Every structure is written in C-alpha cells, then in structure tokens.
Amino acid sequence: GNNDLLKAVDMGKLATDAGMRVLIDFHYSDFWADPAKQKAPKAWADMTIAEKTAVVKDYTMNSLNTLLDAGVDVGMVQVGNETNNGIAGESGLENANTTAIFRAGCEAIQQVEQDRNKEIKAVVHFANPEKQNYMTYAKALADAGVEYDVFASSYYPYWHGTLDNLKNQLNAITEKYGKEVRSCTC
C-alpha cells in the first residue's frame, strides 16, 4: 500500500489541526483488507499465533504512541477492516486464533489509553449487514473475552440493504452487548 505510519502522522496532524479527533484503522495487512481479503503482512507469514498476537500488540501500541507523541488527537482505533471472514491471515470468528488477534489489538489500545490517561475507543469493524450476521460476530467476540467499545459497520446502500436493516442490526448489538455502534464506511 501507499500509507504508512509517517503518512498517517501527517494526515492525523492535519485533521487534529482542523479540530477533529482521528479514527485510526489498522488493516494488519500489507494492502487493503476487506471481507474477501484478510492477508497477513508478508513479514508475519510464518509466525505462530503467539508471535502474531505479540506483534499485533506491539505494532498497535508503538504506532499509537508515535501518533500521540506527534500531537495527533486519536479518539478511536479500529482493529481490522471489514473483518467478517477473519483478520491478519486468520480465518473465521469462531477460530480462537482470529479472536486472539482482536483481543491483542484491543488490549494494546487499552494499554495506551491507560498509560496516556486518554480516552481512546477500541473499534471492531464488519461489513454486509444485509446478511444479518452481526449478532453472531458480537457473540463470538464476547465468548472469546474480546473487550471493545464500538461495533462498527460498513454501509453501502447498493450492496448492504436498507437503512432500517442496518439500524436493526446495530441496535441489537447495543441492546444485547451494551456496545456503541457506528457506520464507519459509507
């Protein structure tokens, strides 16, 4: 891809200078990640799950600290992008390796939040609300002990059904799991 940490710092500073808080979206991939593509970075290809969760945690913490040290007002951090089918090369939310990646990313955010005494919300992000799988995803995360603040959805009206369905899917998450909800990609 053509975005890296230094470019994120530059863009984050511009947004902060304009009075905005910033959402950082870690794809944990060398290129764009979406429901069809969740490839781990090449450097992580031969790692065990223990090594991969450690590098996710370190990478997330180091990147956030770099952004904050540069003066970027980080308000939310997304652990993965459209992660319906996995994250960082791990497949399926019922897979313990997949939820371990989510847990490592969220724990990193919470550690930086605590160390910096700064509220930073941990976000998980999915797509395809029209398939009505969101409660399944939220249950898998809850069962695995993944602690996050915001359940986010992509929403493209052409592909993702009605706004009423999106609202119903997200409201069910709030009612059952007490999570904030957002549409993060429209």
Q: Which stretches of residues belong to each language-model region?
A:
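Anion (oxyanion) recognition and catalysis
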Residues: 16, 110, 174-175
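N-terminal carbohydrate-binding/catalytic regions of secreted carbohydrate-active enzymes
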Residues: 1-17, 21
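Short, solvent-exposed beta-strand-terminating loops
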Residues: 22-34
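Active-site cleft segment of glycoside hydrolase catalytic domains centered on the general acid/base Glu
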Residues: 5-6, 34-140, 146, 161-168
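Conserved, mostly hydrophobic/aromatic
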Residues: 25, 77, 151
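Active-site clefts of carbohydrate-active enzymes
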Residues: 85-91, 121-124, 128, 148, ...
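Conserved residues at the C-terminal ends of beta-strands
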Residues: 1, 80, 154
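Active-site flanking residues adjacent to catalytic metal/cofactor-binding acidic residues
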Residues: 24, 81, 184-185
